Structure formats: structure tokens, C-alpha cells
Amino acid sequence: MSKNTEGMGRAVVIGAGLGGLAAAMRLGAKGYKVTVVDRLDRPGGRGSSITKGGHRFDLGPTIVTVPDRLRELWADCGRDFDKDVSLVPMEPFYTIDFPDGEKYTAYGDDAKVKAEVARISPGDVEGFRHFMWDAKARYEFGYENLGRKPMSKLWDLIKVLPTFGWLRADRSVYGHAKKMVKDDHLRFALSFHPLFIGGDPFHVTSMYILVSQLEKKFGVHYAIGGVQAIADAMAKVITDQGGEMRLNTEVDEILVSRDGKATGIRLMDGTELPAQVVVSNADAGHTYKRLLRNRDRWRWTDEKLDKKRWSMGLFVWYFGTKGTAKMWKDVGHHTVVVGPRYKEHVQDIFIKGELAEDMSLYVHRPSVTDPTAAPKGDDTFYVLSPVPNLGFDNGVDWSVEAEKYKAKVLKVIEERLLPGVAEKITEEVVFTPETFRDRYLSPLGAGFSLEPRILQSAWFRPHNASEEVDGLYLVGAGTHPGAGVPSVIGSGELVAQMIPDAPKPETPAAAAPKARTPRAKAAQ
């Protein structure tokens, strides 16, 4: 029996991140016998968690902005998302704490948003409204149109270029915010979102202001149990479909036939898993440079990948505190602590590769919403700081700098947000870009794969249907539509659009030779 025949009706998914799990669910619904392989000990990838001393640390994404995308996924698999996962709407969404003492609170309620803008800068109310109108236009084109179909052919790009021009995709996110409003606080509030998908707000295309419309239209939600609860529920659907989750298992290579067709994978222990369809949720850079290292490639060569711009790195400090549940009452679920510099600090991270003395921080306090995040009376936090990735000549040696940088982060949050927190910390874990490189096999330790600049977006990203190998498909942050929970879930939908239903197994009656009827025999 050939490997191709062995793999008929089987699909292998490399990586149990949200994109891989979404693809696996959809392939299971298409009739494939699916095996998901991941080197970690639990599903979720960057959206997984670790627990220490009763504190659950959500390692990556913390919010859900488009719950309808998840509900659609579940429904397409004959399931009800809301029976499997409990989502809690956030109100307010988050608070931005500026160094001059000003605060901006983002709400789902339009009247509250207008009042907040008017309080900070009355003259910018109309400009803010116009910005949100522009965000809606980009959402309708960029998310509902471009983001929901593959961009695998050059014509897919050419036919949308006029719309890109009309929407001023050449302008940066910050450039668009600057044009609409005059107040620097509001300019930050309208332009910082690309940092949550790995982009430099001063260079990322203004198409990404659509994130503001995502928040407005769908709200900001939190899953009880963290994003890990979503990943666990996805894995449960896959096994209920008859699929298999193989954790603590690393893939060594994607197997390719002489005629250029993916035929399965080889594990590190030498085991081969034949498959008709191979989906990689590993980072696109790792997929091509490592998993296809023995395959000649024409577009995604090592040299071309090395020339790409990768997203920034992340320094993330996870810590638990004792007896603090009633402390810091003005600190909610999500807070952004802004440093004294904006553009210059972003340039340090993305252009110069320098670890600056100042910083902007995202502070996540899930225990104010989710009692499962920490022991009763305690708190769980994660504090995230964007930092350079590992691709600079003057790169940061995190084995030396991690503790020093953590001390700087502690100083900022004690002074600005959580006074006295140092003496309350009982558990902690630190992730640096080196952790992202080693744990997630992320090129240069990038937090969000390829940076979403205009010439690294849509058709310019590694395609969902591999250009190098037939029968190989890519999902996750490094392919189309990009990073962020809605996009990686959407990448699973895109590959499912391109993959036909599994072949139906032959029934015994259909497979057996037809018996001659007496009449047919007599006629001979």
C-alpha cells in the first residue's frame, strides 16, 4: 500500500494553536480523520496557559473581539459555542493611563465614548466620529471581504488595488489618527492597536484601524478560564469528531512526494504519519525553513525569509499576589500604561533594536473578572512590554537583561498603577523573546510572526495554500489574514474553503465485484 493510499481521508495538523485547532475542527466536519500534533503539553499554542501556586497565567491573547467568528465555527461543526465556553462582555473595554495623569477609558456604549472624547478634547469629537466612520469602511472591506477569502492568486490582489487606493492604505495607522484628531492622548488611543498584532503604528497600513470597528461592533469579551478554555473546548470537538490530539510530540519534517505533493509528516522519533492533507499551524518561517528544509523552494527560500520584517518581541512578566483582591480598586481587567515617549519608543523597538529605559505596558488582571484565575482573595497579573526581536546585530542578551528589565517594569507599575505590589508577589514566570523562540519556534522570537506592513499583508504573506507544496496548507499569524484571535480562527476557515470534502469510503457492496444475475448468465 503506497503512502498516498494510506493517507487517503486523513489530515494532519501541525500545531495546536487556535488556527490549527480551527482548521482541524473544520476538516473533521468535512469527514477527515484528523490528527493534531503539538510539542506542548496542552492545546492552545500561544493561547495556552500555565498554572503555578493556584494562579492561572494566560500566556498570550486575553480577549475575544469577534465572538461571532467562534460561534460560526462551532455551528459549522454542528455544535453550540455558548454551551462549551462562557464569554463575559467587558465594560469598560480598557483604560489607558498616560504619564501626565490623563486617562482615557474605552467603552462599548457610544454615548460614553463621545463623552470621554469630549472631556479630553472637545474640539476632536467630530474628528473622532470621522475616524470611526473610516474604521467601519476598512472593516467592511478589509475584514468582511478580504479577510474572509483566500489571497492566493495575483489577480486577487490586482482587483482590490483601487479600493486600497481609495481607502488610503498607503497611510499609516498613526498618520490617519493624526489627520483626524489633534489631541495626543486621542492620537495614541486611536493608533496603538497594531501593537497587539505585532505592528509598528507609524508604518503599518491604515487598513488596520478596522480594529476600532471590531471593538465597536462586537465588543470586547473575556472567556472564563482564559483563552485556554476556548482551546480546550476546540480540542474536545476534535476528539468528539473522532480526531486525535497528540501532545508532547514534535514534528521533524513534512513529507513530500517526488511530484511535489505533501504525503504526511515525520515525527522526531522517526514515526511517519501519512495524510492526504497537511496543515501547518507552525510559524510560516519555521514551516518553510525547518519542516521543508530538504525541499527546493522558489518563493519562500531561506534568503527571502531572512529579508522579511518580523514583528517585535515581547517581554511578559506573569505574577500572582497574595491577599490583594480588595486592593487597587481602580485597576480593572485591562490597563495600558503609556510611557513618556511614543514614536521614539516605537522606533527603538522596531527600527533600532534597542532596549529603552522607558516603556509602555499592557497590564492584565483577570482575577477581577474570573474567580478561576487565582486563589480566593488573591490576584493574577500579566504585564506585557513590547521589546525588540532577536534579529538585530546589537541584540539583547536576555540571560543578562531579563532580571534588570523586570526590575524596571516593577518600578513603573509600582509608581503608576500598583503601589506596594512587590511585597505581595508570591509566584512569577517571565517570558522573553528567547522563550518565544524556544517554546513556540518563532523566528527571531517574534511575538506575532511577520510584521503586518502593507507589502507583508494579504497576497504578500505566505499563502494559505502553500506555493511550494501541493496539499500543504498554512494557518496562523504568519499567513493570511494575519495575527489576532479573529484572524487566526479565520485562517482555519480559509483553508477549509480550499480543501475538498474527504473522499467517502467505499461500501462493501460498492467495492465488491458485481455478481452476475441468473438472467445475465443465461444470456451469455
UniProtKB/Swiss-Prot annotation:
One of its GO terms (biological process) is carotenoid biosynthetic process. Residues 507-524 have a biased composition (Low complexity). It holds the Pfam family Amino_oxidase. Signal peptide: none annotated. Belongs to the carotenoid/retinoid oxidoreductase family. It catalyses: 15-cis-phytoene + 3 A = all-trans-neurosporene + 3 AH2. Its cofactor is FAD. Pathway: Carotenoid biosynthesis. Its EC number is 1.3.99.28. PANTHER family: B-CAROTENE KETOLASE, PHYTOENE DESATURASE. Converts phytoene into all-trans-neurosporene as the major product, via the intermediary of phytofluene and zeta-carotene, by the introduction of three double bonds. Both intermediates, phytofluene and zeta-carotene, can be used as substrates and converted to neurosporene. 1,2-epoxy phytoene is also a suitable substrate whereas the C30 diapophytoene is not. Keywords: Carotenoid biosynthesis, FAD, Flavoprotein, Oxidoreductase. InterPro entries: Amino_oxidase, Carotenoid/retinoid_OxRdtase, FAD/NAD-bd_sf, Phytoene_DH_bac_CS. It is an enzyme of class 1 (oxidoreductase). Is inhibited by diphenylamine (DPA). Is also slightly inhibited by NAD, NADP or ATP in the presence of FAD. Gene3D superfamilies: FAD/NAD(P)-binding domain. The keyword Protein biosynthesis does not apply. This is Phytoene desaturase (neurosporene-forming). The keyword Oxidoreductase applies. Residues 500-524 are annotated as: Disordered. FAD binds at residues 12-45. GO terms for molecular function: FAD binding; oxidoreductase activity, acting on the CH-CH group of donors.
